[in-house]
């Protein structure tokens, strides 16, 4: 009888509990995004297994980061208001068309900067 009463109280308590609010979105751009990714994803250099050989996927990620591809992607997706207007420089018609194509193609990094990311969104960007 006591077990049934306890079970009923637990069910009632969980039914009365308010639903959890949606996860907060934070606008993350540039180095703030990189810091958040390192915090959420971690990496082989920060993990306890740092003495073990680096996994192939992690090695590729480290090489990618060292070659500054991530920084290039962040700059490419930066706010167009921060870039000089390519229309003012007649010597750069090719770069202007590239910028227009880049602005059309949105990616996760761009979305994090413009509309914000949740922790779950950041986890989706982790390589492992």
Curated annotation (Swiss-Prot):
Main location: secreted
SMART domains tied to this protein: IlGF
Membrane-crossing segments per the record: none
Tissue/organ expression: Expressed in Leydig cells of the testis, and weakly in the theca interna cells of antral follicles and the corpus luteum of the ovary.
UniProt keywords, alphabetically: Cleavage on pair of basic residues, Disulfide bond, Hormone, Secreted, Signal
GO BP term (any one): positive regulation of epithelial cell migration
Molecular function per GO: hormone activity; protease binding
Region (Disordered): 81-101
Subcellular location: Secreted
Cellular-component GO terms for this entry: extracellular space; perinuclear region of cytoplasm
SUPFAM superfamilies attached to this UniProt entry: Insulin-like
Protein family according to the UniProt entry: Belongs to the insulin family.
Stated role: Seems to play a role in testicular function. May be a trophic hormone with a role in testicular descent in fetal life. Is a ligand for LGR8 receptor.
Protein name per Swiss-Prot or TrEMBL: Insulin-like 3
Gene name linked to the record: Insl3
């Amino acid at each position: 009888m006591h077990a049934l009463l306890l079970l009923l109280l637990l069910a009632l308590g969980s039914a009365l509990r308010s639903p959890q609010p949606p996860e907060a979105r934070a606008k993350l751009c540039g180095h703030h995004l990189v810091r958040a990714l390192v915090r959420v994803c971690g990496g082989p250099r920060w993990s306890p297994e740092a003495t073990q050989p680096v996994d192939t996927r992690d090695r590729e990620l480290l090489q990618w980061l060292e070659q500054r591809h991530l920084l290039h992607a962040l700059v490419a997706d930066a706010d167009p208001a921060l870039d000089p207007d390519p229309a003012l420089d007649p010597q750069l018609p090719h770069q202007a068309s590239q910028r227009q194509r880049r602005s059309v193609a949105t990616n996760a990094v761009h979305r994090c900067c413009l509309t914000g990311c949740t922790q779950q969104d950041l986890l989706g960007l982790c390589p492992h």
